[in-house]
Each structure stands twice: as C-alpha cells, then as structure tokens.
Amino acid sequence: MADNDNEDIIMDDLVEEYVETEEENFVDSEEESEDKDEIVESPSICEGFVQASSQTLVIIPDNERITSNVLTTFEATRLVAVRAQQLAINGSTMLKKKYSSPIDIAKQELFNRKIPLLVMRCIKVTPEGQKIVEIWNPREMGIPLLD
C-alpha cells in the first residue's frame, strides 16, 4: 500500500489500523497499546500513544518469540474484517485479479500472503505497567481455513 498523507486511525477495543509504509523495520522500543491482541501495520505506530498513558509497550525480538507461528481463527477473521473495512472505504488492493466484494479481496490477500497488516499479541503486563508483546507478520504465519 502506498504512503498516504492523511493517515486515518480507526480504533476500537481490539484494533488499531494504520497506513503501511513500504519498509517494515522492526525496532525494539517502548510503546503503548490496547489490552488484547491487536492488528497493526507497523510497531512504530504506537509511539504517539506512549505519552497518553503510563503504560509502556515492550516488543519481544523476532528470534525470542514464545507464541505459536499459526494465526488463530479469531486473528485471521479479524485481519479479514479490518482489511475488508479498509477496502470498502476505497483502499487499494494488493491483488491483480478482480474480486466482487471487499471480504473476498481481503481473504485472498490473506491466503496469498499479501495482506498489509501485522498482529500484535500481548504476552503479559508487568506490575510496573509494562506490556510485553510480540508483533507477527501474517506472511510468516500459518493461516487457518476460513469459510
């Protein structure tokens, strides 16, 4: 997805979505996020929220991850829903083939490993208020079948 000057942020209890940059540089840093697993496009997107809360976010390096590299059905469904919502409001597709609905496009992007989103999994929250998370790219994860 190309850079967009006016980055739209849609937030609810589970999701923060952002415009993806072409480079995906994962840097260990302290950032803040929601309490549940989230879908994000870049770890750096949380930096703006650090000042708004006393809680900080610690990202586990890729080589020290402890959770499974398989998407849960919930995560896969949520990825499709968020991406379909982006496409429904005139987001650009990552596919060359034409599909009839945003949901079909989002499913195909996920299964073709072209979906421009990341999954943030919360590992634990420390007594000091630090949230320890892993950030996964769905392109490197196993994908469950969705009906």
Curated annotation (Swiss-Prot):
One of its GO terms (cellular component) is DNA-directed RNA polymerase complex. Part of the viral DNA-directed RNA polymerase that consists of 8 polII-like subunits (RPB1, RPB2, RPB3, RPB5, RPB6, RPB7, RPB9, RPB10), a capping enzyme and a termination factor. This is DNA-directed RNA polymerase RPB6 homolog. It holds the Pfam family RNA_pol_Rpb6. InterPro entries: DNA-dir_RNA_polK_14-18kDa_CS, Pol_omega/Rpo6/RPB6, RPB6/omega-like_sf, Rpo6/Rpb6. One of its GO terms (molecular function) is DNA binding. Gene3D superfamilies: 3.90.940.10. Signal peptide: none annotated. It is found in: Host cytoplasm; Virion. Component of the DNA-directed RNA polymerase (RNAP) that catalyzes the transcription in the cytoplasm of viral DNA into RNA using the four ribonucleoside triphosphates as substrates. Keywords: DNA-directed RNA polymerase, Host cytoplasm, Transcription, Viral transcription, Virion. GO terms for biological process: transcription by RNA polymerase I; transcription by RNA polymerase II; tRNA transcription by RNA polymerase III; viral transcription. Belongs to the archaeal RpoK/eukaryotic RPB6 RNA polymerase subunit family. It comes from the Viruses.
